[in-house]
Amino acid sequence: MRGLLVATWIFVSVAASATPTTTTKSPPPTTTTLSPQILKAKLPPVVKNATWECGTDEFTKSISEGEIQAKCPKLRDHINSCCLQHDGCYEAQSGQKFCDDTFCSCLERRSRSSKSCHDESAPLFCDLVRTFGDGAYEASGPNASTTEESPAEKDDYDYESHVAGLNATPSSST
């Protein structure tokens, strides 16, 4: 359900940013609150023609790639490098705020050569990870797939072991 919500949010945000507006001033980018250390951090290397990784599933990746292809196609690999770095940061569990701040800084710096990408797409992507990144961050943790059995799920009777024991017992043919 959360993935559908994220996908819907991305779709609505992209559709809204694609329609002409009469306002002349864009909202200030989210990156204005970043620490000087993050703003000066080394940018990740650009991997040419890598698989697009901005999004949580194939649908959101398709929407986000379409956004970049429409507004700043020459920056595709640069923006994707920010997403790859962000994914790695989440997997390393380096702290969600740190990962998101680094991602937003990367987007802001990588998109400077395109006004529409810098003023619209980068802040949109930044806001999306800040708004919906909790689940992805938690799922990226090393123990994300482990669960504990509830008392109702624990069963004293082990059917598989019982059947295996029956199959291992030699049958009497007399």
Curated annotation (Swiss-Prot):
Single GO term (MF): phospholipase A2 activity
Residues modified by glycosylation: N49, N143
UniProt KW Glycoprotein keyword: yes
Record keyword Secreted present: yes
Disulfide bonds listed in the record: none
Localisation per UniProt entry: Secreted
Keywords of this entry: Glycoprotein, Secreted, Signal
One GO biological process term: arachidonate secretion
Region of interest (Disordered), ranges: 137-174
InterPro entries listed in its UniProt record: PLA2-like, PLipase_A2_dom_sf, PLipase_A2_His_AS
Signal peptide coordinates: 1-18
One CC-aspect GO term: extracellular region
Similarity section: Belongs to the phospholipase A2 family.
PANTHER family in the record: PHOSPHOLIPASE A2-LIKE PROTEIN Y52B11A.8, PROTEIN CBG09474-RELATED
Protein name stated in the entry: Phospholipase A2-like protein Y52B11A.8
